Amino acid sequence: MKTILITGGAGYIGSHIVEQLVNINHNVVILDNLYTGYKSLVNTKAKFIKGDIKNIKLLRKIIKENEIETIVHLAALLNVSDAEKNKKKYYLNNIIGTSNLIRSCEN
């Protein structure tokens, strides 16, 4: 049985993916900062970690300690009008955060 990390797993799409993976008996770890997600959407059979993809040390720890085999990355900020006003926030989360996630997979 695979252990799968879902970033943004407490959001609408992420929580539905978690449900499906849990239903087919995968071990699921959710990483979500709850900026737009809701803890109430988290399946209790999944392991929930409140944290941020901008924290590369946390990402590396999660991947190593949970022996993550697969990652589904859904932790993104999406509001276009807000992105125009807060470019740095969106850059840090969507670009740097994704880069951190990729780098954390390196051995």
Walk through the language-model features, giving the residues of each:
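N-terminal Rossmann-like NAD(P)+-binding domain of SDR-like oxidoreductases, especially those catalyzing
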Residues: 1-107
